[in-house]
Amino acid sequence: MTADLGTTADLSTAPATGGLLAADAPSVVQSIDWLAVAPPTLTALAALAVLVADLFLPAHRKRLLGYAALTALAAALALLIPLRAGDRATFCVTTGTRACSYTADHFTLVIQALVLGGALLTVLLSLDDTRKLPAGEYWFLLLASAAGAALLPASRDLATLVVALEVASLPAFALVGIKRGDRRSSEAALKFFLSSVVATAVMLLGVSFVYATTGTLHLTEIATRLDDVPPVLDTLARTGVALTLVGFAFKTAAAPFHFWVPDTYVGAPLPIAAYLSVVGKAVGFSGLILVTVVAFPSYADVWGPALAVLAALTMTAGNVAALRQNAARARSAVRLLAWSSVAQAGYLLVPIAAAAYSSDDQIGSTVAYALMYAVVNLGAFAVAAVVARTHPGNRLTDYRGLYATRPLAALALGFFLLCLAGLPPGIIGLFAKVTVFSAAVDAGLGWLAVVMAVNVVIALYYYLQWTAILFRAPEGAPETTGTATAPTASAPPRRFRAPTPLTTAIVLTATAGILLSGVPQTVLRFASVSLF
């Protein structure tokens, strides 16, 4: 009986002991911070909602889908406000290390604001440009791509990073080729797709090499384990780092991975060209920053010199090609903006390369420059969309005398071009370039600063040439003299009233550009603080 009682007592205490051990053991269930993931999640849900709603809306109501997309992106932007402290992370490993797959730090929030704001302005450019396009598919693809682009800067492991990159890219292929029956659009989509697939394949090979070397996908853990790589695996690690950079170099349109840019921008619908020039570039640069500065700091001797050379090649290739544009060629205005975006990518690469030689704080210069570039480049595309409604060829010669017919649009475009050139009154463009110069000089990259200075001078020619065209007398117009002249048979061209969404996009970008020029420290402060 005593033995039975003792046995019973032992059995009765066993579950309690097991319960205590279970209570002490860390949970393997990951908690989710829904507020942290709200911006990309809302955008993705809106994409699905728009696609389903398209099935039930009659043709004359399809325009509502565009306003739904606009509302969703505005709401996603508003959801960034409660995250402004930049101290949230989720999908974290619960055992051992505290590595997380999603982090909403200051870098994430700034890039998400850029991406979602760029997508919102793209919607404004598209509202009156989608009548001949499948509305449901168009808005679904745009929102899906924006969701992937918003996810990427928050990704802190290679798996999430690659998935976000592809979610942002795959809808973009379809958007470029969405103009059915347009040979140029189909050709552009095919070039974009094939180039991207090759770059992604090379990048995935690099990711597999990095994983084989470190045994982890979390960026912070990769950085820790690459600090102490066995000599036998050093070559494999270096190869993995180099190949991983290739995929992101393609997304940033860095030379020699830039040849898809002009044909893709020219063949795509104009709003999608604007989207790729800003949001697509933000995706590439944010991914490049994460893998270099966060994951691969131990191999700065590999990616630092490589990115410095790529920066010099990219800005030179873009500016030289822009100089050679024929003003009378069809869509030469869009083609010049495409080559200009390649050159701007070279400037954006400079601080990332500089981070290999000095400190991670140099990354802030890239972020500050990207914010300036996003505002003024989207504004330039908005004015190009206005001109394209009366001149479908969108040649540079079509802009001659724009001030005579559309003075506000001409003034806005002139301001945007001067910002890109870095000349007053585009003060924000000037200061942004100065921060990039400073990053190169502080890192001891004097030769790269000299190359950039030469390229800035080269770019002045085509930016100022386009600006001058805006204020010249229109073709065939009589020269202005001091005496009155009799009216001629050729009346001035009839004024065209721009759609309200296009006008809104121009006003928003021009206002933002003027405010940033008046208070440049709004974005330049990112160049002097750590964003991680």
Swiss-Prot record:
It catalyses: a quinone + NADH + 5 H(+)(in) = a quinol + NAD(+) + 4 H(+)(out). Disulfide bonds: none annotated. Keywords: Cell membrane, Membrane, NAD, Quinone, Translocase, Transmembrane, Transmembrane helix, Transport. It holds the Pfam family Proton_antipo_M. Its EC number is 7.1.1.-. GO terms for biological process: ATP synthesis coupled electron transport. NDH-1 shuttles electrons from NADH, via FMN and iron-sulfur (Fe-S) centers, to quinones in the respiratory chain. The immediate electron acceptor for the enzyme in this species is believed to be a menaquinone. Couples the redox reaction to proton translocation (for every two electrons transferred, four hydrogen ions are translocated across the cytoplasmic membrane), and thus conserves the redox energy in a proton gradient. NDH-1 is composed of 14 different subunits. Subunits NuoA, H, J, K, L, M, N constitute the membrane sector of the complex. This is NADH-quinone oxidoreductase subunit N 2. It comes from Streptomyces griseus subsp. griseus (strain JCM 4626 / CBS 651.72 / NBRC 13350 / KCC S-0626 / ISP 5235). The gene is nuoN2.
